[in-house]
Structure formats: C-alpha cells, structure tokens
Amino acid sequence: MNLKTVSGSAVELSEVAFGREFNEALVHQVVTAYLAGGRQGTRAHKSRADVSGGGKKPFRQKGTGRARAGSIRSPIWVGGGKTFAARPQDWSQKVNRKMYRGAMQCILAELVRQDRLVLVEEFAVAAPKTKELLAKLNDLNAARALIVTDAVDENLYLAARNLPHVDVVDATAIDPVSLIAFDKVVMSVAAAKKIEVELG
C-alpha cells in the first residue's frame, strides 16, 4: 500500500502490516491480556487462619448470655481475619504470537484509516530541548503523541521526558496499549520499514 509522508513523498508499505481489516474482538483480547500481564499480583490479606492467636475458645459455649464464639480471630470480631482473604495471584493470560501480531496489524491499519499515523522522513532534535520538540510536534498537530524511531535517540528521549503526553519508543519496543493510548503516532519511515519486517 502507498502512504504519504508529511513532506509529500510516497512510501510503499506492506498491506499485511498496515492495511489489515480491523478485528475488534482480537484487539480487545490482546490489549486485555497485555494489561493483565502488567499486574503485580502481590495483593494479600490475612484470613482467620493467618491472624496470630485465637486458638483458645474465648468463653464457654453456654450460660454467659453472649453469642457463642470459638475464636477471637473470627472475621466478625475486631482484630479478626478477613472473610475472603485475597491471595497472591498470577494474572497473566496466554496470547499466541500469531494473535499478538494480528492485533498489532489491526491497530496500525486502524491508525492509518483514522489519519492518526503521521509518517515523517526523519524525526530528531539537535539538542535535548523540550521547547524544540514541542515546536516540531505542534507543526505536526500532534500534541499528544507516541514518537516511534528506528533507533534509540538520547536527545529525543531527554527532550520528551518532561512532556506528560509524549513518549518516545524504538520500533522494536512498540506495544498495543501505547499505540491506542495516544492521539497521534509520529513514525519515521525507517521505523515503519522496521515494523513492516517484524509484522509483514
């Protein structure tokens, strides 16, 4: 497929990587799995079995006038355990490589259809200056943008570090959530070619 850069020059890119029909169910599944994989899963509470003490019956069964009790660590007592105590859990979901690649292709193709993918010949800043980067992004009408480069550019990374709605990633490190989260994806032609090889 033929795409145009901001300067107007044509770029030939794979129909497979940048022109696939959108599959909402697939994208939803992959994005959900990606977010689930990011969960720490270390949440833990103490049940009545975990709380220290409570082995002895606090008072006799009958004759006190009180409700019967077998332990001072019952969940209905102050200082007792939690009824359904949370346990550490692995939240990760299995996603096949083919599904992941398919979802990435769907997202990139949808970015193209929605005019949210901005192709540039090259995207760099002379010095790590936020002001300079902001001016470039404003020229591209991309205030909230993910910048995808073909290689790690320290100047660009440092210039974008202080901008809350701008992120810089290498073409090999893009993920489905980042591509969806930003209003625009500013991508160099070299990065697009790199992605084409990965997903094509």
UniProtKB/Swiss-Prot annotation:
SUPFAM superfamilies tied to this protein: Ribosomal protein L4 (SSF52166)
Which UniProt keywords are given for this protein, alphabetically ordered? Ribonucleoprotein, Ribosomal protein, RNA-binding, rRNA-binding
Corresponding gene?
Answer: rplD
InterPro entries (alphabetical): Ribosomal_uL4, Ribosomal_uL4-like, Ribosomal_uL4_dom_sf
Annotated Gene Ontology cellular components are:
ribonucleoprotein complex; ribosome
Q: How does it assemble?
A: Part of the 50S ribosomal subunit.
Q: Where is this region: Disordered?
A: 42-65
Extract the Pfam families matched here.
Ribosomal_L4
Q: Which GO terms describe its biological process?
A: translation
Source organism: Acinetobacter baumannii (strain AB0057)
- Its function? One of the primary rRNA binding proteins, this protein initially binds near the 5'-end of the 23S rRNA. It is important during the early stages of 50S assembly. It makes multiple contacts with different domains of the 23S rRNA in the assembled 50S subunit and ribosome. Forms part of the polypeptide exit tunnel.
* Name of this protein: Large ribosomal subunit protein uL4
Q: What is the lineage of its organism?
A: Bacteria, Pseudomonadati, Pseudomonadota, Gammaproteobacteria, Moraxellales
Q: Which family does it belong to?
A: Belongs to the universal ribosomal protein uL4 family.
* An example molecular function term from Gene Ontology annotations: structural constituent of ribosome
